[in-house]
């Protein structure tokens, strides 16, 4: 019965995710990301890592799961806010959509066509915060140690 649910539910979930992928990023996501970037001071580096697994749980997890999420914030309050948002709203089935939405939030004028899929990405760009500038580095790809995929965002203040 459990396998039947997985096979019946997975296509419906995937279709719903495809329909919403690449819509305009949520204002709340943009807000927590901009607050995270704005909190960095000159010479300071902040980061978070959002781990996702679709179709199975992470490698060392005991229980079975259709999907799983984890977020590492290192105790940084601004990163904790991003992680709280991503744990509630971040996509697992199309994890690259969360990455593209985040880049679109922080890099003005950047958009992605609905046909774009990210399998591996590493990009860096400037962001001008209210009081100072920052360099943002985004990486996305396979996570060999835990399994699944990982989206990392690092901000280095000028």
Regions found by a protein language model. Give the residues of each.
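Short, low-complexity, Pro/Ser/Thr/Gly-rich segments in the mature regions of secreted, periplasmic
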Residues: 146-158
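Positively charged n-region of N-terminal signal peptides that target proteins for export
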Residues: 1-4
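Short, exposed beta-strand-loop hairpins at the edges of beta-sheets
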Residues: 135-147
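A mature extracytoplasmic/lumenal domain signature
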Residues: 87-89, 142, 155-157
